[in-house]
Amino acid sequence: MRTFALLTAMLLLVALQAQAEARQARADEAAAQQQPGADDQGMAHSFTRPENAALPLSESAKGLRCFCRRGVCQLL
């Protein structure tokens, strides 16, 4: 009887370990999809001010462009 209980406990532990490994693999896969990869870095947005805008720019501000990438914006 004691042998049966030990075998049952071992089988239960093996099943729980396999289930935990599968969950960890899914969590790792989801985390990898959420992180920005090298292919995401090529996507950027650029904004320029039209020449006929209502407010005139000073001479030093003419030709400036805003270049944004994933939360970081730079003036060019």
From Swiss-Prot:
Start and end residues of each stretch annotated as Disordered: 25-47
Disulfide bonds: C68-C73
Site of covalent link Cyclopeptide (Cys-Arg) (interchain with R-65 in subunit A): C73
GO biological process: antibacterial humoral response; antimicrobial humoral immune response mediated by antimicrobial peptide; cellular response to lipopolysaccharide; defense response to fungus; defense response to Gram-negative bacterium; defense response to Gram-positive bacterium; disruption of plasma membrane integrity in another organism; innate immune response in mucosa
Bias (Low complexity) ranges: 30-44
Signal peptide (from-to): 1-22
Residues that make up the propeptide removed upon maturation: 23-64, 74-76
Per UniProt, location of the Cyclopeptide (Arg-Cys) (interchain with C-73 in subunit A) cross-link in this chain: R65
Key words, A-Z: Antibiotic, Antimicrobial, Defensin, Disulfide bond, Fungicide, Signal
Post-translational modification summary for this protein: Forms a cyclic peptide with subunit A (BTD-7). An additional intersubunit disulfide bond is formed.
TM region(s), chain numbering: none
GO cellular component: extracellular matrix; extracellular space
Pfam families to which the protein is assigned, alphabetical: Defensin_propep
Similarity section: Belongs to the alpha-defensin family. Theta subfamily.
Quaternary structure and interacting proteins, as annotated: BTD-7 is a cyclic heterodimer composed of subunits A and D; disulfide-linked.
Function: BTD-7 has antimicrobial activity against the Gram-negative bacterium E.coli ML35, the Gram-positive bacterium S.aureus 502a, and the fungus C.albicans 16820.
Protein name stated in the entry: Theta defensin subunit D
Source organism: Papio anubis (Olive baboon)
